[in-house]
């Protein structure tokens, strides 16, 4: 599948917005993958766990205030389900801080996010094992296909299936050259945790 943009077509097989050709900051859409899914899957939190939505600072020497979408707005104690429903930033950062950013990073790897930057491969000192990962602040962003396949894993009872562009390649005589008919899969979330995450996401609607 090729997904283009606006303007006149000037090249063939150039920029494909559906694939890894382009990546953008995911923002709050990363929260279920890096924060709430891991929080439920590790058993550290439940949908009813209380988190205090109050002024909170990132750790480190350059500690900055974590802001919600509406700056200066704090809702006090709220459940994880409520924090997910209204997409509050402070609870998400607090939860990831307790889990540790490394845990969130590891889950994103399992969800098939291919653009992650590890501390070992930092770009000008920037990497993704940081608290701001909870809010989608990523060094290289995320591609559409990675996000789609990650969310598909949630819909598939926590099982990730590596996306493919074709199932088979045949030669002129019908012989199979490449066979992708059996996809690569692995478990990311256990089914109970995945069910809870889906219930939380349904509250958003």
Predicted regions and their residues:
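A penicillin-recognizing enzyme superfamily signal
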Residues: 1-22, 140-205
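A generic secondary-structure signal for well-formed alpha-helical elements
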Residues: 42-46, 99, 103, 108-115, ...
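Active-site SXXK
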Residues: 25-51, 83, 149-154, 197
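Mid-domain, small-residue-enriched loop/turn segments at the edges of structured enzyme/sensor domains
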Residues: 64-68, 100-147
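Solvent-exposed loop/turn segments at secondary-structure junctions
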Residues: 6-10, 25, 56-58, 78, ...
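Generic beta-strand/beta-sheet core signal
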Residues: 2-5, 33, 48-54, 81, ...
